[in-house]
């Protein structure tokens, strides 16, 4: 199969993975309209083509949180990545390190912080959820820091899990889920051998101490649902700011007032995100929410964004809307599931090439020059 875009990686992932895993990557909340709008609203952003601008040298590199990187891109925290490919977090981290972009490890990863650091020998970002057990959170922060995590991405848009109907239909949850998953795995023998057999252990590495012997998928889902903390407030983040000495990024912000609150508690950045449309269906797409947030706090925080990014062209669009950098989640998960580390490497190379083409054809030579002036029309601010 020829792979030349994220769409191709998605199809290859669909063919390889059991349905419950593919739908877990591919699905969203409720009717999945916000998930679709993430893609559609970003694709509708028209760029202003310029000519005769001397774009003989185009440089897509940038600096985020004091670190120079090859692209204004980071691999977003994606849960259960080690189930998409054998020790998937390690494969993705190696690909990111080789390209010179950050990899962000999810709290709910198969490979833990120490295994990822050993695999890539490069500092990484770490993502943390809001959990009831503050002692466990403190221990996890300490482990991540000791393993070399430099930037903490604190996810705040999951006080409760979203309603993901597709998961119930596919066997990730719902009646007889375990039996349905076994049948689906048997129908995908290449995945079953490579990941199901050779990819052990399948425990959730970072939360294994809390789970104890109960480390199966259903155990994990139940533990996570029971440990989300809906009572947390902005004032509760002070101890996280005090505990984490590196850059702190608040992920899951869609409103300028929340972005201002993040700045007020001492955060270094925010991620404009609706969790890939996996939490509350009907909220703004990231592309629509981004400009107002960039206007409100762009001089106080590093504004990042995710949601609907499928190409280097989409990265340029997000930067033009006000982001300093972009997190890529589903796109790299598809690539990883399809071809492992080589797939993620190929995806990042595609994004690099697509960014360079888009920059050249809009007349910009460096990332700092990408702003609203390359848009064909002024984008209205939400709110």
From Swiss-Prot:
Q: Which cysteines are joined by disulfide bonds?
A: none
Taking the record's annotation, the residue ranges forming a coiled coil are none
Intracellular or extracellular location(s): Cell inner membrane
Q: Name one Pfam family in it.
A: FMN_dh
Q: Name one GO molecular function term.
A: FMN binding
According to its UniProt entry, the protein's GO biological process terms are:
aerobic respiration; lactate metabolic process
Q: Gene3D superfamilies in the record, alphabetically?
A: Aldolase class I
Quickly give the catalysed reaction.
(S)-lactate + A = pyruvate + AH2
What SUPFAM superfamilies does the record point to? FMN-linked oxidoreductases (SSF51395)
Keyword entries, A-Z: Cell inner membrane, Cell membrane, Flavoprotein, FMN, Membrane, Oxidoreductase
Q: Where does FMN bind?
A: 106, 127, 155, 251, 306-330
Q: What InterPro entries does this protein's entry cite?
A: Aldolase_TIM, Alpha-hydoxy_acid_DH_FMN, FMN-dep_DH, FMN_HAD, FMN_hydac_DH_AS, LldD
Major localization listed first in the record, in broad terms: membrane
CDD domains from the entry? alpha_hydroxyacid_oxid_FMN
Q: Per the record, what is one GO cellular component?
A: plasma membrane
> According to the UniProt entry, what is the EC number of this protein?
1.1.-.-
Residues annotated as catalytic: 275 (proton acceptor)
Q: Which family does it belong to?
A: Belongs to the FMN-dependent alpha-hydroxy acid dehydrogenase family.
Its function, per the record, reads: Catalyzes the conversion of L-lactate to pyruvate. Is coupled to the respiratory chain.
Q: State the protein's name.
A: L-lactate dehydrogenase
Write the lineage as a comma-separated list: Bacteria, Pseudomonadati, Pseudomonadota, Alphaproteobacteria, Caulobacterales
């Amino acid at each position: 199969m020829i792979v030349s875009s994220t769409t191709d990686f998605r199809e290859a992932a669909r063919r390889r993975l059991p349905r419950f895993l593919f739908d877990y990557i591919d699905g969203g909340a409720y009717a999945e309209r916000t998930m679709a709008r993430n893609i559609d609203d970003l694709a509708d952003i028209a760029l202003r083509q310029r000519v005769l601008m001397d774009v003989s040298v185009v440089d897509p590199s940038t600096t985020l949180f004091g670190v120079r990187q090859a692209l204004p891109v980071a691999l977003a925290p994606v849960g259960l990545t080690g189930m998409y490919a054998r020790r998937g977090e390690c494969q993705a981290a190696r690909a990111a390190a080789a390209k010179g972009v950050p990899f962000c490890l999810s709290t709910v990863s198969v490979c833990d912080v120490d295994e990822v650091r050993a695999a890539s020998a490069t500092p990484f970002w770490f993502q943390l959820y809001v959990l009831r057990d503050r002692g466990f959170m403190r221990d996890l922060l300490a482990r991540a820091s000791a393993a070399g995590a430099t930037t903490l991405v604190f996810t705040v848009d999951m006080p409760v899990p979203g309603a993901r109907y597709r998961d119930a239909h596919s066997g990730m949850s719902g009646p007889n889920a375990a039996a349905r998953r076994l049948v689906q795995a048997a129908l995908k023998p290449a995945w079953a051998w490579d990941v199901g057999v050779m990819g052990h252990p399948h425990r959730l590495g970072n939360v294994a101490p809390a789970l104890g012997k109960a480390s199966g998928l259903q155990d994990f889902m139940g533990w996570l649902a029971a440990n989300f903390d809906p009572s947390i407030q902005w004032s509760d983040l002070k101890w996280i700011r005090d505990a984490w000495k590196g850059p702190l990024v608040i992920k899951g912000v869609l409103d300028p007032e929340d972005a201002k609150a993040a700045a007020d508690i001492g955060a270094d950045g925010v991620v404009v995100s609706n969790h890939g449309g996996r939490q509350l269906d009907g909220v703004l797409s990231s592309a629509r929410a981004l400009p107002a947030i960039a206007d409100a706090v762009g001089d106080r925080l590093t504004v990042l964004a995710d949601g609907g990014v499928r190409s280097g062209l989409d990265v340029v669009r997000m930067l033009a809307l006000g982001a300093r950098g972009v997190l890529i989640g589903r796109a790299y998960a598809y690539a990883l599931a399809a071809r492992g580390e080589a797939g993620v490497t190929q995806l990042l190379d595609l994004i690099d090439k697509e960014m360079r083409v888009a920059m050249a054809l809009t007349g910009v030579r460096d990332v700092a020059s990408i702003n609203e002036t390359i848009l064909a029309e002024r984008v209205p601010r939400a709110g």
